[in-house]
Amino acid sequence: MKREKYLLRTRFYLFFPKINRSYWGREHDYDKEIFQVYAVLGCCFMFSRKCALDVTPLDEKPFLYEEELILGISMEKAGWKTVYDPKSVVHHLHGNSTEKVKAFAYTCNICSEIYFCREYLKMKKWHILPLYWYRTILYGLKMIKYQDFRKYVGEYLRKSKKELRMAF
């Protein structure tokens, strides 16, 4: 999963189309096919009481991002499988909860990503730093377009650096 953080969760995915397609399950028919997945990002999920007892307590540290991947790790360790079933439909307004607070949501994403890399992938600081620099450059580019990114830059740096220091 360390490899995926760089190859598929950054713009490097453009150079690895086969791996990217497989990672995101694009070889499946999302409208008709039930298939096993590692995690479903941005999902509404259901599990049995037995499964809930096996995978709880949930990690409360990440906020808005990475929770599904952490749950996937817990499910795998406990011997449970995660499946995508197209017959299960939940209407979710993507981005409505974060649309008005883009810089805040981005900051939460980066802090949760650093935490996930450190605690669950056991990445060393020299693995995390390039990813952090990449995300920070993207933050800088977003400042050009979005006023809230300009306004929130101090908070982004303070929170992300605090999370990053915990990796050292």
Predicted regions, residues:
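Conserved short hydrophobic patches within well-ordered secondary structure
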Residues: 19, 63-64, 140-143
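A short, conserved alpha-helix in the catalytic core of glycosyltransferases
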Residues: 30-33, 38-57, 61-89
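Residues that scaffold the ATP/ADP-binding catalytic core of kinase and kinase-like folds
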Residues: 54-55, 93, 116
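Flexible, glycine- and charge-enriched loops at secondary-structure boundaries
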Residues: 62-65, 99-106, 150
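Nucleotide-sugar-dependent glycosyltransferase catalytic core
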Residues: 91-111
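Non-catalytic, C-terminal membrane-associated alpha-helical segments of glycosyltransferases
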Residues: 104-112, 122-168
